[in-house]
C-alpha cells in the first residue's frame, strides 16, 4: 500500500490497471475517473495488484483470509484500487460502512490450470474462464453485486468469489497428500469465481462509483483498448503486475 498526498486542492485523474492472473491467465482490467480534492495536502491510499503466481503465495490484493499457500494451484491477479482511508487491501473495505471510502477499482485476471484461458478482469463485470481440458471446470466473473461462482467437480470444496478476493476450489489429493487447488479467480470489487480440476477461473469486476466521469475497460476488449500505464500507447489488457497513475488536471 502506498500513500499519495495531493499537494493542492483541485481535480485529479485517477487511473488503475488490475494485475494479470497466473499461467494461461486473463489480463487485468482498467478503470479511470475524476476525483476532486477540496483541500491542500489531501491523502489517498493506493494498493497495486500483484501478478498471479504458480503454486505459491496468493497475490497481493487478492489474498483469502484463510489461505497462505496455494498447493498445486494457480493464483489470480490482484486488483488495483484507490481509497480515502488507510485500511490496506481491498477486502478490508467489505463492510457497508467502509465501501464509500473506495474511489475506484480495476479488476484482476483469473488464472487457469492446464489448458484454456482465465477470464479477464472487468469492466463492470469480470469475464468467465474458458477451460479447454476435458472435464475442466469454469469460474464465473465477478459482478457489481456478487462474487463469481466457483466451478468444481462433485465432492470438491468450493469457495465463491467475494468482495475484494477471488474464489477457489480444491480436493484432497492422495498423491500429493494435501489439498490440490485448481485456479483462483481474479481480485476485484467482487472477485471472480475459481475452479478446481484443470479449470479456468473468472476475472474480478472493476468499480468507478467513487469518481465522476468514470469508465472501465475489460482486459479482453479489442474494440476499446486500454491506455498503457506510460500513456504512450494502447493495449488489450494489462500484463504482469497492476499499475496506478494519478495526474493533477486543475487547481482550485
What are the functions of these language-model segments?
Residues 1-6, 167:
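Surface-exposed ligand/attachment interfaces on beta-rich extracellular proteins
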Residues 6-13, 38-43:
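Extended extracellular/luminal ectodomain segments enriched in beta-structured repeat modules
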Residues 11-20, 46:
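A short beta-strand element within beta-rich, extracytoplasmic domains
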Residues 26-137:
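Secretome/extracellular-domain signature
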Residues 97-99, 234-243:
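Extracellular interaction modules
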Residues 101-103, 123-188, 192-194:
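Acidic, glycine-rich loop-and-strand cores that form catalytic or ligand-binding grooves
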Residues 105, 238-252:
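Short, structured beta-strand segments at or near domain termini in extracellular proteins/domains
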Residues 163, 194-239:
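Contiguous ligand/interfacial binding patches
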Amino acid at each position: 500500500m502506498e500513500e499519495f498526498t495531493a499537494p493542492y486542492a483541485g481535480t485529479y485523474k485517477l487511473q488503475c490497471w488490475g494485475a494479470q492472473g497466473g499461467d494461461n491467465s486473463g489480463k487485468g482490467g482498467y478503470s479511470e475517473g475524476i476525483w476532486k480534492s477540496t483541500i491542500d495536502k489531501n491523502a489517498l491510499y493506493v494498493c497495486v495488484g500483484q501478478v498471479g503466481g504458480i503454486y505459491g503465495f496468493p497475490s497481493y490484493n487478492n489474498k483469502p483470509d484463510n489461505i497462505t499457500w496455494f498447493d498445486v494451484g494457480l493464483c489470480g491477479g490482484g486488483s488495483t484500487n484507490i481509497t480515502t482511508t488507510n485500511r490496506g487491501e481491498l477486502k478490508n473495505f467489505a463492510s457497508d460502512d467502509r465501501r464509500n471510502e473506495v474511489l475506484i477499482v480495476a479488476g484482476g485476471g483469473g488464472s487457469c490450470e492446464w489448458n484454456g484461458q482465465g477470464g479477464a478482469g472487468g469492466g463492470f463485470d469480470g469475464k468467465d474462464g474458458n477451460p479447454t481440458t476435458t472435464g475442466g471446470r469454469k469460474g464465473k466473473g465477478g459482478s457489481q453485486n456478487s462474487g463469481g461462482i466457483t466451478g468444481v467437480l462433485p465432492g470438491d470444496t468450493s469457495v465463491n468469489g467475494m468482495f475484494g478476493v477471488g474464489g477457489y476450489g480444491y480436493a484432497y489429493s492422495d498423491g500429493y497428500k494435501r489439498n490440490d487447488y485448481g485456479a483462483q479467480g481474479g481480485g476485484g470489487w467482487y472477485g471472480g469465481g475459481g475452479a478446481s480440476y484443470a479449470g479456468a477461473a473468472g476475472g474480478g469486476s472493476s468499480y468507478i462509483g467513487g469518481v465522476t466521469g468514470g469508465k472501465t475497460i475489460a482486459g479482453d476488449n479489442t474494440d476499446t483498448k486500454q491506455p498503457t500505464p506510460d500513456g504512450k500507447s494502447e493495449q488489450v489488457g494489462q500484463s504482469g503486475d497492476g499499475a496506478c497513475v494519478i495526474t493533477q488536471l486543475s487547481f482550485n
